[in-house]
Amino acid sequence: MNPVAFSIGSFEVRWYGIIIALGILIAMTLVSINAKKKNLNFDVILDLFLWCFPFAIIGARAYYVLFELENYHSFWDMINIRQGGLAIHGGIIGAFLTAFIYCKVKKVDFLAYADIVAPAFILAQGIGRWGNFFNQEAHGGQVTSEFISKFPEFIQRGMYINGAYYHPTFLYESIWDIFVAILLMIILYNITDRYKGVVISAYISLYSLGRFFIEGLRTDSLYFMNIRVAQLVSLLGIIIGIVAIIIIVSRGKKKRKGIFIN
């Protein structure tokens, strides 16, 4: 499979970049719809994007390099992302911290904006996973031809690498992410404003739940003391998300208000 969509002179335009751009475009469109529904200022979202996107890239790269330090021998190697090496957890952490700081400085309601962004963010993640497909990366271990035959033919071709078939873990995560995006949209449009933070908390816990199990199938995991880093971070995400939901809902009930819009 050719990861290059087309070339302009010596400059290669890769499918990965096209798909990421498409994911961002769709996500921003969805956020604009959510902002209008919740009477929030979309200009704030645009400002957040301009700040969060570069710091998400920095976070994704720093996270990856941190656990692969032995493979990098110069500062240029560390910052050269053209050769790959971005970790989604690092990107999420980078974007989350940047958004939190921005909202504090600008005195913007962080949870309100985080809730309308969460469904779009995980939808973009689900779309972005198809970039891994074109790069033939982020796959699982070897599988039999009988197993892979259950998938569409183009998936079979894409997962045939160096004479063997592999688990299309990118597909598993993409499906899970899109499912979670739909679920978060349902929650967002039906929950009262008294429960701000529930949607972003559900995102953290549900994304982490899917990633925890899918990570166990992958062959390119980052490790810390023989522990898959992504599974450890996902486990923490599940706990943090669930605890946050419990706290938010319990506080809301004390106000004697219903959880859902009538």
UniProtKB/Swiss-Prot annotation:
Q: Which domain of life is it from?
A: Bacteria
**What is the membrane topology here?**
Multi-pass membrane protein
Q: Which residues cross the membrane?
A: 15-35, 40-60, 83-103, 108-128, 169-189, 197-217, 229-249
Report the InterPro entries cross-referenced here.
Answer: Lgt (IPR001640)
Is this entry keyworded Transmembrane? yes
Q: Which residues bind a 1,2-diacyl-sn-glycero-3-phospho-(1'-sn-glycerol)?
A: R129
Pfam assignment, any one: LGT
**Keyword Cell division among record annotations:** no
Keywords from the named record:
Cell membrane, Membrane, Transferase, Transmembrane, Transmembrane helix
**GO biological-process terms attached to the record:** lipoprotein biosynthetic process
Q: What is its EC number?
A: 2.5.1.145
Tell me which GO cellular component terms the UniProt record holds. Answer: plasma membrane
* Gene Ontology MF: a single term: phosphatidylglycerol-prolipoprotein diacylglyceryl transferase activity
UniProt xrefs under HAMAP family: Lgt
Family annotation (NCBIfam families): lgt
Q: Which family is it part of?
A: Belongs to the Lgt family.
The protein's name in its UniProt record: Phosphatidylglycerol--prolipoprotein diacylglyceryl transferase 1
Source species, please? Clostridium perfringens (strain 13 / Type A)
